[in-house]
Amino acid sequence: AMYQENAPELIYYMALYRIFSEFLDDVSEDVLPNEGLGFRDSLIWNKLYDFQKDAALAIINKLETYNGCILADSVGLGKTFTALAVIKYYESRNKDVLVLCPKKLRDNWITYNSNVVNNPIAGDRLQYDVLYHTDLSRTRGTSETGLPLDRLNWGAYGLVVIDESHNFRNGGDSASEDRM
């Protein structure tokens, strides 16, 4: 028979495959998150909603493919926790991580990599460094987070997370641009 009855769900899946098959061909094992690292067993991963988990995996894929990604969700959707899951993944791969944030957000980021009672993910033992946006324009001294700016090995970071990155949309001095 030339006609065969198919469930609507099958037609839907076939349409999705036809639309996204080229994308699926581009996805290789090299850019998919390594499940053997156990990052899905982390405290931060298990605090995420499904949409945040999807975002974290997509970010990792984009970072591995393009060496960069922008997470631009609306206010209140948990960008910080999504970023923390990505940080956990890279730290699981023994990559050093730098978080650049405005001074007003210091306490948020310091809490999540510290062994303090109000850190809900202290068991994940995150070890990222924190610098302020304004530290990029300095070449001497010590950051308020204790890092020596004149001896900092900027090239050692396997991941740089920039919180409130829209603050960089206007030109700055050349010293900070060289580090970026």
Tell me what each language-model feature is.
Residues 1-74, 81-93, 155, 159, ...:
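ATP-dependent helicase/translocase motor core
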Residues 36-47, 80-84, 88-179:
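SF2 helicase/translocase NTPase motor core
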